[in-house]
């Protein structure tokens, strides 16, 4: 029953690539959508590299072990992991620094991170989310939303609101959890 008959109205906004059909059933508007799993082999490959890079991080009680891969539109890649060159650097920051040191223009690039990019920091002036927005990345792909252990992360939400395409592949999250078993 619709709201006019004492029923509830449920609103679902399908993704742009979903195939949907609309019909009326017993006086109700019904939308049926076919959703396809998001399994780009390219995304999974780069994300697996990021997860592997996260395993190179020295475990710390004050931070997650994260890996990141910057992929430029021309196909060049730059990989980093948490604490690679400094005890305060995050993986995204390390990979971005390497790309900038190589003279790369990051506008339109993608970044693959084993964990959701941080949205606030106490050890650096800019969060990874701010760095991603500042440098004009068009896509962010990660495996695991950042747990609320240290801060309440809003990275994915902030990036989406700014128009950045955000993809999450939880099928690779197990490797991220393993790399961060020291925080369990």
Regions found by a protein language model. Name each.
Residues 59-65:
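Short, flexible loop/turn motifs enriched in small residues
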Residues 86-97:
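A short, polar/charged loop-to-alpha-helix boundary motif
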Residues 89, 113-130:
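Local cysteine-cluster metal-coordination motifs and their immediate loop/turn environment
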Residues 65-72:
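Short beta-strand scaffold segments in enzyme catalytic cores
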Residues 105-109:
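Short helix-loop-beta connector
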Residues 5-7:
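Compositionally biased, low-complexity flexible segments
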Residues 77-83:
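A short, conserved beta-strand element enriched in hydrophobic/aromatic residues
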